Design a protein with these regions (language model features):
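Soluble secreted/lumenal catalytic domains
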Residues: 1-179
């Protein structure tokens, strides 16, 4: 993954990853023009078995270390969470019958999907965030049930954004090998 990285990860070639890096550069410019109040990150790497969780700690800071390549991928991060919007998203999800809760552990280890997405799209770490977990229940539901669950989560999130008057951009973390 080549974005703004630690020195050992700086790109040294015009190889196959360049189009991906250029796409992130274009996305950054697009987001800059939108001037969002908040970035929402729905990450498949923060898996929850019971319901949908929302980050509920005002400031989360640390170093993310990749468990497979700890000497290559180390990112310092510092994110501020939009607690009011996260709580509104959680409440709206509950109102639509979803199991949802706030994650309020100050020692919570932020998942690498959230951190990497934010690092690549907004390396300044200057826009508040709402982190949303990936509820694993769709793996145990039919396709239609899983899609309906995600549709309700989207509607709840949209309602919360509208009620709070935020300008928001939704970022969906993913990897090229998740199929």
């Amino acid at each position: 993954v080549y974005a703004e990285n630690p020195p050992q990860n700086e790109p040294r070639s015009e190889g196959g990853w360049e189009p991906l890096r250029w796409a992130y550069e274009r996305a950054r410019k697009s987001i800059e023009r939108l001037k969002p109040d908040v970035l929402l990150v729905h990450s498949p790497h923060w898996m929850t078995q019971q319901g949908h969780h929302f980050l509920g700690v005002e400031n989360l800071r640390g170093t993310s270390v990749d468990p497979i390549f700890p000497n290559l991928f180390r990112y310092k991060f510092g994110l501020d969470v939009d607690i009011a919007l996260a709580e509104a998203c959680c409440a709206e999800a509950q109102n639509l019958g979803l199991t949802a809760k706030m994650m309020c552990n100050p020692d919570f280890r932020v998942d690498y999907g959230t951190i990497t997405t934010l690092l690549m799209i907004r390396p300044q770490w200057d826009i508040p965030v709402v982190g949303i977990s990936a509820n694993n229940s769709p793996y145990y539901l039919t396709l239609d049930e899983g899609l309906e669950e995600m549709d309700r989560l989207g509607k709840a999130t949209r309602a919360a954004i509208e009620k709070t008057g935020r300008r928001a951009v939704l970022l969906a973390s993913n990897t090229l090998c998740h199929w």
